Amino acid sequence: MFEGKAPDLAVVAAVASSPKHEFSKNLQTGIRLLAGIGVEADAHAGVTVQHRSRVRVDPTQPNLRQIHLIGAELHRQLVLSGFTVPHGALGENVTTEGVDLHALPTGTRLRLGTDAVVELTGLRNPCSQIEEFRSGLLAQVLGRDESGALVRKAGVMAIVLVGGVVRAGDLIAVELPIPPYRRLERV
């Protein structure tokens, strides 16, 4: 859980999108975030849930997974474990640098660049598609803490509050919610 202050410097390392329901997303020079929708022309953009597994359960539920963010730190950890995974390959729209996304509380707002603002809704739930993408990778993005509780390391999900264009190199400003903080849970 979050303990401390927001980072002094965080940046967007990469941006990606895909119009198809594919596991990986294609790197872009910039992506346009649309308020209440997600990434323009991305398969997961929409007011209601767009992830196929969620649509099968209830297609009318709100889309709390409009945008997927992963820290570049995960990519480096994967390299140390023998997995070279390019930005966007795990399905993330935004790769960040310099902010521990998993330690932030639910409701944290991230200003991406000059205009766009997203609000963290929860943790990405790593699924079998990660293992299908690369054998052994699922075990790298799941772990256990000291108490034995499951730890998800495959990024966080967010909704878009304010639209705008986001590019690699854009600064990220972190705005914490009013305490008490709530731990990010699977969405």
Which stretches of residues belong to each language-model region?
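Metal-cofactor-dependent catalytic cores
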Residues: 1-187
